[in-house]
Every structure is written in C-alpha cells, then in structure tokens.
A protein has these predicted regions:
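Short, glycine-rich nucleotide/cofactor-binding loops
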Residues: 3-18, 46-52
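C-terminal structural segments of small proteins and small subunits
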Residues: 84-112, 116-117
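Histidine-anchored nucleotide/phosphate-binding helix
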Residues: 16-30, 37
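Short internal beta-strands
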Residues: 35-41, 74-78
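A glycine-rich helix N-cap at a beta->alpha junction
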Residues: 53-80
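Short glycine-enriched, charge-decorated loop/helix-capping segments at active-site entrances
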Residues: 50-54, 91-94
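Short amphipathic alpha-helical segments and helix-helix/interface helices
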Residues: 24-25, 61-65, 106
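Short, active-site-adjacent cap segments at secondary-structure transitions
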Residues: 44-47, 83-84
Length: 119
C-alpha cells in the first residue's frame, strides 16, 4: 500500500512527532510505500533548521533527516512555512525538506491508498 502522511503537529509536541516517525518506519518495514510526508500548519516548524527538543529527548530533526536519506519526500507547505518563518532564503529550512504548494498534498493523496493526518 502507498501512504501519504500529513503532519500538523508542532515539534514541541514531541510525542506526536515521535509516534509518526515510528509509524513511518513500521510501514516501511512492512514493505509499504510512503508517497509523501506533508507538513502544514504548525507542522511546518518541523522543518526549521534550528529545531531543538527538550533535554533527554531524541533530536527530532535528525530523525526526519534519516527518513529523507531513505528517499522519503518531506514536503512543507510553503504558505504555512512562510507564516512561521521557515524559508530557503533565510536558510531556516532544514536539509532534506522541500517547500511546495498545497497541490502537492492533493496529488499525493490521489496517488495513495491511504491518507493519515497527525495533529
């Protein structure tokens, strides 16, 4: 099966973020495909290059980078990113993430068997 995942959770909600990352790895282990991970609303903050987590927690940005290294597309809604100060121009967009329009979410949903939203 092919999945599209929309992440709306802020990186400050590290439990939701870690859960979705674990879900993606579980899906990959079961030989499912990830069409795209789309970050919107406060989820766009996941792509902030200066992303930090609370002491004692795994560095979430490095976990996202590991997924990008597996050729998982990490697409960030350009409108959500702009409202939250995430941009390529200011070098605040982390490596492995790409700014895209909302149409990329729609096309990914159409190409997928399942769509999951994480708040």
């Amino acid at each position: 099966m092919k999945y599209t995942i929309s992440v709306k959770a802020s990186p400050q909600d590290s439990k939701a973020t870690k859960t979705v990352i674990d879900l993606i790895y579980e899906l990959l282990e079961r030989k499912h495909l990830i069409e795209r991970v789309f970050f919107q609303h406060d989820g766009a903050l996941q792509a902030l290059s200066t992303g930090e987590t609370a002491v004692g927690q795994e560095h979430l940005l490095s976990l996202w980078k590991s997924l990008a290294d597996l050729d998982i597309e990490l697409a960030v809604c350009i409108s959500s990113a702009a409202k939250r100060g995430v941009s390529q121009k200011s070098n605040s967009l982390a490596d492995g993430f790409e700014l895209v329009g909302l149409g990329q979410l729609i096309s990914a949903i159409e190409a997928s068997d399942r769509y999951i939203e994480v708040f």
